[in-house]
Structures are given as structure tokens and as C-alpha cells.
Curated annotation (Swiss-Prot):
A GO MF label: prenyltransferase activity
Protein name: 5,10-dihydrophenazine-1-carboxylate 9-dimethylallyltransferase
Uppermost EC category: transferase
Activity control, per UniProt: Does not require magnesium or any other divalent metal ions for activity.
Enzyme Commission designation: 2.5.1.121
Listed pathway(s): Antibiotic biosynthesis; phenazine biosynthesis
Annotated knockout phenotype: Mutant can form only nonprenylated phenazine 1-carboxylic acid.
Length: 299
């Protein structure tokens, strides 16, 4: 199959998935992104994501992971005019992480409406990194340093598997895949959210958290507080999870194209100052190498 045919097939899958979940699909937004990353799409893992209750709820997000470590995904976005260059620290953080840490591969997120949004740096499961070391980077939000005590208390500090860079919202995600068992128990979830100044978790989140394998936190440069905490679950059957399934999530699960990945999903519940929202990531294109990384690819 030629590269152009491959892109046409992928665009058709994105377009069909947006139709299924009732989201727009802007060809003039999506096609330039596919073209910019054309050389690495065949070897990547591809997934589609929807969420509820946020400013992004009307968009379909697409994710490419397993991008090669010698590729700077943000530089590619800049050179292809997919995002504007910025003097904000978010614009230099990925390069700092790449220069000082053993990044194994990269990823990107883009919306069928919103365009290029995020990049990701993945560490190998046998080479998890320290939040203390990441906090020392010049461009890292100071909130990482301010919350090292919390990370220590719940066995999270030395278990960072992914760093996410949200260029659209100017925030950072730290993914922890080795937190203490207590972190997933109802008391632990309540304590973590309380320390973050977030509302008490719903009973739904407490039940869901007991099945989770990873936690990630969102921080920005505007505050030293953790803005959001997300618990993630790997599942072949999201409909069986102990949560109320939103209509758009159900549509993605039941009606969107399967691709080569079959029935593979990551479901997340996020706690915010304004309440909780849900998200789901449906894998479309699979690579066998991702099996060991799946615990790090947490929605």
C-alpha cells in the first residue's frame, strides 16, 4: 500500500469515527497533520479519544505513539505550521526532557477540530524516571517541586513513565505507573484529592479507582497546585466498568472502526475543581511492542 493510500485510509477512519461520535472533522486541519507525520504513521500506534464535560468534549482527539526517539514531534509541528512558536516555557520543556532523560519514544495528540495539541515523552517500563529530577528542569512548572512531598507519601516519585506537554492549554502531565497500592484504595484516593484541594471523590470514582493501574496529574505554570488527577483503567470491555457510560463514549466503543487493534481501550476518570469527567481512548492501529508500554499509555 502506498503512503498516500495509507493516509487516505487513515483519514477515512478518522472521518468515520467523528461521524459516529457526532463531532466535526475538518479536512484542512487533519490532512496537514497526517502529511507532516506521514513517514512514521505506519510504525506508530494509533488511537482515538473522546471525553465528557470539558471544553474539548465536542472534539475527537487522535493519538500517534511509538514515534521514534530521534524525532522531535514538537519541532515537526512547528516546521509544518501546525502550531505557533511560543516563548512560554511549555515550548522548551520537551527539548529539556529529551536532552537530560532516556526517552524511549514520543507521541502526539491532535483534534479533528482543534488541530495539534500535545506531545508525549515515554520512558521504558524498566527505566521509570524521578519526579525530583524532572522538577529540576528549568522549564518545568514549580508545582512539581511543591508537590514532591505528596508524590513521596504515595510511592509515586520514582515511577514517572510519561511526560505530556499540552501546548494548547499550556500545562504538563506526569504519569505514574508504580504508585503504592494505597493510592488506588478509597481512603488513598480521598486523601490524594484532599491534599490537592480537589472535591471529595464520587462513589463512582472510588469504585473505579480500585481497578486502575495508573495515576496522572496535571500542572500548569499559573499555579503551584495540582489542577487535575486522573485514574486510568486498561480494559477490553469498557461497558463492564463500574461507571455510568456517556452516550458519546458508548458510540465510540460500539460503532467506531476497529482497525487492527481490536477491542483495546483505556478509560479514565478525572477529578477537577469543578467536578469529575470521563474519557476513553480506543486503539485503532496496534504494534506488538506496545504490550509492555501499555501501562504508560494512560489516556
Amino acid at each position: 500500500m502506498s503512503e498516500s493510500a495509507e493516509l487516505t485510509e487513515l483519514y477515512s477512519a478518522i472521518e468515520e469515527t467523528t461521524r459516529v461520535v457526532g463531532a466535526p472533522c475538518r479536512r484542512d486541519t487533519v490532512r496537514p497533520i497526517l502529511t507532516a507525520y506521514e513517514d512514521v504513521i505506519a510504525q506508530s500506534v494509533i488511537s482515538f479519544r473522546v471525553q465528557t464535560g470539558t471544553s474539548d468534549a465536542g472534539d475527537l482527539d487522535c493519538r500517534f505513539t511509538l514515534l521514534p526517539k530521534d524525532m522531535d514531534p514538537y519541532a515537526t509541528a512547528l516546521s509544518n505550521g501546525l502550531t505557533a512558536k511560543t516563548d512560554h516555557p511549555v515550548g522548551s520543556l520537551l527539548e529539556e526532557v529529551h536532552r537530560q532523560f532516556p526517552v524511549d519514544c514520543y507521541g502526539i495528540d491532535f483534534g479533528a477540530v482543534g488541530g495539534f495539541k500535545k506531545a508525549w515523552s515515554f520512558f521504558r517500563p524498566d527505566s521509570l524516571q524521578s519526579a525530583s529530577d524532572l522538577a529540576a528542569l528549568p522549564s518545568m512548572p514549580s508545582g512539581v517541586s511543591e508537590n514532591l512531598g505528596l508524590f513521596d507519601r504515595y510511592g509515586m516519585t520514582d515511577t514517572v513513565s510519561v511526560v505530556g506537554f499540552d501546548y494548547a492549554k499550556r500545562s504538563v502531565n506526569l504519569y505514574f505507573t508504580g504508585a503504592s497500592p494505597e493510592s488506588f484504595e478509597p481512603r488513598g484516593i480521598q486523601a490524594i484529592l484532599r491534599e490537592c484541594g480537589l472535591p471529595e471523590p464520587s462513589d463512582e470514582l472510588l469504585r473505579f479507582g480500585e481497578e486502575a493501574f495508573a495515576i496522572y496529574v496535571t500542572l500548569s505554570w499559573d499555579s503551584q497546585k495540582i489542577e487535575r488527577v486522573t485514574y486510568s483503567v486498561n480494559t477490553p470491555d469498557p461497558m463492564a466498568l463500574p461507571v455510568r457510560i456517556d452516550t458519546r463514549i458508548e458510540q465510540l466503543v460500539k460503532d467506531a472502526p476497529l482497525g487492527s487493534a481490536g477491542h483495546r481501550y483505556v478509560y479514565g476518570v478525572t477529578a477537577t475543581p469543578k467536578g469529575e469527567y470521563h474519557k476513553i481512548q480506543k486503539y485503532f492501529q496496534w504494534q506488538s511492542r506496545v504490550e509492555k508500554m501499555l501501562t504508560a499509555d494512560a489516556g
